[in-house]
Design a protein with these regions (language model features):
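Nucleotidyltransferase catalytic core that binds NTPs
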Residues: 1-179
Length: 179
C-alpha cells in the first residue's frame, strides 16, 4: 500500500509544545509528514527572531526528545515568494510529494484546495497559551516561557542567547518608531 504523506507549514517562531503535539497527532493520520519551516528568509525581527537554521535545529532536537521516528518526517525551510498564484507550485518543487495539506491559514487552505489537494485543519493544542506570539511576549516580559517549549528548545535558546536577542530587537523597533 502506498504511503500517505502530509505537509504542515509553520513559521515555528519559536518551536513550542503545540507544534510537537500537532505533529504527533498528524502522524496518527498520515505515514510521513513534510514540515515546512515557513518564512525561512526572515530572522532577527521581533515577530521572526530566529533563522531558518536555528528553527530546523530546534525542531529536530524537539522531535528527537519526543521520540518521533526520524524516518517519519522531512524538515524543509521554505522561503516566501509573495506571489500567491504560483506559491503551491513553489512548495511542490521544494518538497517531497504529498497528498494531504494541514493548515489553519485560510489563504494556504484556499490555494491548495484550488490545486486539488485534500486540505485538513491541523489539530490545535492549547492555542491560547501555545503560540509563538505568547512565548515571545513572555520572553520579553521575563515571564515563564520555558514550560511552553520542549527542553531541547530551552537548550538551543540558551546557546544562541535568544532572550537577549529578542529584547534587543524590541529596543530596536521602539527606537525606529521615533525616526
Amino acid at each position: 500500500m502506498e504511503k500517505v504523506r502530509g505537509i504542515l507549514i509553520g513559521r515555528m517562531q519559536p518551536v513550542h509544545n503545540g507544534h510537537i503535539e500537532v505533529i504527533k497527532k498528524t502522524l496518527e493520520e498520515v505515514d510521513e509528514i513534510v514540515i515546512g519551516i515557513g518564512s525561512a528568509q526572515k530572522s532577527h525581527e521581533l515577530k521572526d527572531p530566529f533563522t531558518a537554521g536555528e528553527r530546523v535545529v530546534m525542531l529536530t532536537q524537539a522531535l528527537i526528545e519526543n521520540n518521533i521516528d526520524p524516518g517519519s518526517y522531512y524538515i524543509i525551510p521554505m522561503e516566501d515568494i509573495n506571489f500567491n498564484a504560483i506559491w503551491v507550485a513553489h512548495v511542490k518543487m521544494m518538497t517531497p510529494p504529498f497528498s494531504v495539506v494541514y493548515s489553519g491559514n485560510s489563504l494556504v487552505k484556499q490555494l491548495f484546495y484550488e490545486e486539488g489537494f485534500e486540505v485538513r485543519n491541523p489539530p490545535l493544542y492549547d492555542r491560547m497559551n501555545l503560540s509563538g506570539t505568547e512565548i515571545r511576549r513572555r520572553m520579553l516580559e521575563d515571564e515563564n516561557w520555558q514550560e511552553l517549549v520542549p527542553q531541547a528548545r530551552i537548550d538551543i535558546k540558551e546557546e544562541i542567547n535568544s532572550v537577549e536577542r529578542l529584547k534587543n530587537l524590541a529596543i530596536k523597533e521602539i527606537s525606529e518608531i521615533g525616526d
